[in-house]
Regions:
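Polyanion-binding surfaces on beta-sheet-dominated domains and ring/shell assemblies
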Residues: 1-148
């Protein structure tokens, strides 16, 4: 049986993270830690979960992107303010997590959409959904500036 939230939230996820290159608010290159989905899955099993998987959800036309609003920037580039959704299964628990389709902290425009970005967004949705619902990796988001 999977350990409870209060136990899992105490696991330091940082040593299990990989790093990706990004830029800070001033454009300075930085490295940002992220927990790979496969490592997240293994940690769940190591902490008592028997069955762990996620399913990318499809929209009404069979695609993996959900659109919330079409927006044009000053150069007339278009984005649908896209997001993805996954259904996460951990033993007898099932929950859904939505995640915006982003390129780091940048908007993904229609002319830069690709399958890798969509797949990465599904993986991020899984990891963040696990953190919210189980506590595993939750501390990785404690300093996130979600309201900016």
């Amino acid at each position: 049986m999977l350990k409870g939230f209060n136990e899992l939230v105490q696991i330091d996820g940082l040593p299990f993270c990989d790093k990706r290159k990004a830029k800070d608010d001033n454009g300075k290159p930085i490295e940002v830690p992220y927990l790979p989905w496969a490592k997240c899955k293994m940690l769940l099993h190591e902490n008592g979960a028997s069955e762990v998987y996620f399913l990318p959800l499809k929209n009404e036309t069979g695609g993996y992107l959900f659109q919330s609003k079409e927006v044009h920037d000053k150069n007339d580039r278009t984005t649908g303010c896209y997001f993805v959704s996954v259904e996460i299964h951990i033993d007898d628990k099932t929950f859904r997590m939505d995640m915006p389709l982003m390129n780091g902290s940048l908007v993904v425009y229609d002319d830069t959409l690709n399958q890798l970005r969509i797949s990465n967004a599904h993986a991020r949705a899984f990891v963040k959904g696990v953190a919210i619902h189980t506590g595993l990796g939750f501390k990785l988001w404690l300093n996130d500036k979600d309201t900016e």
